[in-house]
Amino acid sequence: MGPENPLVSLSAYTTQLQEHLPPVDTIDATAKAKNGATGTISISFGTTLSGSELTVACQDGVVSVTHGKISIGNKTEEIQDERSGVPPEVRAWGEALAAGKANERQSPEEALADLELIEASLRSGEQGGKPIVLQYQTW
């Protein structure tokens, strides 16, 4: 969303689908940006679905990333799929360390913004979907 249009609130429902993953293994949330745009966030480690999917629909088109492919409009390309964000994050951290320069995308502020989304989702879910005001989404 960016610094000029940060997320400002989030409302979520949470549940535990798998007995061995307490207390919560699934989050379904709706987030609202400063300009009023809304979007959904769905994260589950308890579902039977395999893989991950990311879709962003905007005024000028749609971008989808799923199973090693990225689609922008009608054009689809293969991309490197490492099954999680961990290897690229560690690689970027190592490159920044070797260069002696911090990676802005791995700043404490970025981490705080990510943590805030997860914590707000859990708190909202505990309160039956009550909207939570977000404070740390501007970076």
Where are these predicted regions, by residue range?
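C-terminal helix-rich "cap/oligomerization" subdomain common to oxidoreductases
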Residues: 34, 96-139
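Rossmann-like dinucleotide-binding domain that binds NAD(P)(H)
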Residues: 1-38, 44-49, 109
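A generic structural motif
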Residues: 32-34, 57, 73
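Short acidic/polar mixed-charge low-complexity motifs
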Residues: 6, 35-37, 61-62, 75, ...
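C-terminal substrate-binding/catalytic lobe of Rossmann-fold NAD(P)-dependent oxidoreductases
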Residues: 49-51, 57-60, 64-67, 88-90
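Short polybasic amphipathic segments
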Residues: 54, 68-75
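Active-site loop of classical SDR/Rossmann-like NAD(P)-dependent oxidoreductases
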Residues: 80-91, 106, 113
